[in-house]
């Protein structure tokens, strides 16, 4: 009896509810344990003045249904945030509430699901970054993750600078003189805006500036700069901008020294390839050893080469020559 009573005591002493299993998708969707705890604290029980109209049998299960709806709202917010990671939290919350409206019919369940969406709103990214910096051990050298983030930020900034770079085009006017038109693509908030600056006339008194966010060009202001340039200076600038490297630099957005280095390296590679084709590999050379005097003498004595080619053999099967009897012939 003692052997049977010991396992029974162990079973009674063990907790009735099993330990909750860890969500395998928590690294991707985020931790929802805090939100679920808030749901359990938010719905401790139903007030006695609001019974369910369906019947008294469903009132004990109403608490579990609301808690389940709230926890499902936490999970829906995490899924919406994982699908649209770049969107704002307000947009993700709106999508979560719409999903709760589609999932539940009753107003209380929809409200509980929406409360789960509100409880799963993540902390601001600045606080998360501060926590990560606090958890990182102090070190004198930068880690690989910091170097990678710095490289990505540099690439993004260079790409944005390339998009917002200035492109210059030359147009032909009635007086046969080229007048530059400058177009600048810049970001204003979250919208891409184009600014066009036109230089009118050979001796301009005004610069026309146009801005085109999404509609036709609209003149916004007229500036009057004071230009004091001489004819020789203008001609020298035209000569500097008329070469090949300046033209390619304006069209590609790359600096002139990068284009010059690429051109110089390409010429060196072409010369190297042309020199490599003239030199053969060492294995293709035929090495002839010089002959000694005895080898030359042996070749001259032992050589039985015919001086003239032999005659072809006579054809034995040829018919004999035809003989005529002259005494039988009469003249």
Curated annotation (Swiss-Prot):
The terms describing its cellular component in GO are: Golgi membrane
Keyword Ligase listed? The answer is no
Q: Where is this region: Disordered?
A: 15-62
Pfam families in the record: BSMAP
Source organism superkingdom: Eukaryota
Query: Which residue ranges does UniProt annotate as crossing the membrane?
Result: 258-278
The UniProt entry lists membrane topology as: Single-pass type I membrane protein
User: Which segments show compositional bias classed as Pro residues?
Assistant: 45-54
Q: Where is the signal peptide?
A: 1-21
- What are the alphabetically sorted keywords of the record? Glycoprotein, Golgi apparatus, Membrane, Signal, Transmembrane, Transmembrane helix
User: Residue ranges for motif Microbody targeting signal?
Assistant: 329-331
Does this entry carry the keyword Transmembrane?
Answer: yes
Q: Name one GO biological process term.
A: branching involved in ureteric bud morphogenesis
Q: Which residues are glycosylated?
A: 90
Location of this chain's protein in the cell? Golgi apparatus membrane
Q: What does this protein do?
A: Modulates the O-glycosylation and complex N-glycosylation steps occurring during the Golgi maturation of APP. Inhibits APP transport to the cell surface and further shedding.
Name by which UniProt lists this protein: Transmembrane protein 59-like
Q: Which gene carries the instructions for this protein?
A: Tmem59l
């Amino acid at each position: 009896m003692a052997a049977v009573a010991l396992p029974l005591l162990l079973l009674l002493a063990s907790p009735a509810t099993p330990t909750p299993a860890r969500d395998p998708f928590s690294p991707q969707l985020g931790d929802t344990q805090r939100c679920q705890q808030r749901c359990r604290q938010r719905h401790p029980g139903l007030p006695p003045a609001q019974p369910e109209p369906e019947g008294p049998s469903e009132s004990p299960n109403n608490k579990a249904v609301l808690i389940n709806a709230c926890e499902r709202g936490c999970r829906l917010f995490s899924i919406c945030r994982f699908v649209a990671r770049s969107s704002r939290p307000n947009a993700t919350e709106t999508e979560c509430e719409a999903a709760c409206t589609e999932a539940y019919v009753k107003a209380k369940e929809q409200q509980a699901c929406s409360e789960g969406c509100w409880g799963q709103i993540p902390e601001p990214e600045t606080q998360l970054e501060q926590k990560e910096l606090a958890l990182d051990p102090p070190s004198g050298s930068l880690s690989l993750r910091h170097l990678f983030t710095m490289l990505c930020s540099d690439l993004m900034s260079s790409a944005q600078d390339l998009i917002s770079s200035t492109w210059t085009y030359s147009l032909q006017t009635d007086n046969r003189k080229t007048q530059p038109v400058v177009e600048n693509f810049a970001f204003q908030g979250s919208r891409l805006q184009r600014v066009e600056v036109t230089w009118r006339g050979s001796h301009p008194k005004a610069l026309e500036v146009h801005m085109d966010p999404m509609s036709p060009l609209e003149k916004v202001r007229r500036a009057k700069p004071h230009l004091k340039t001489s004819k020789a200076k203008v001609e020298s600038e035209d000569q500097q901008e008329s070469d090949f490297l300046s033209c390619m630099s304006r069209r590609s957005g790359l600096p002139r020294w990068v284009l010059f280095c690429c051109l110089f390296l390409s010429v060196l590679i072409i010369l190297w390839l042309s020199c490599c084709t003239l030199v053969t590999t060492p294995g293709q050379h035929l090495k002839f050893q010089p002959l000694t005097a005895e080898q030359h003498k042996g070749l001259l004595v032992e050589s039985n080469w015919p001086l003239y080619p032999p005659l072809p053999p006579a054809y034995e099967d040829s018919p004999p020559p035809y003989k005529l009897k002259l005494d039988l012939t009469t003249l």
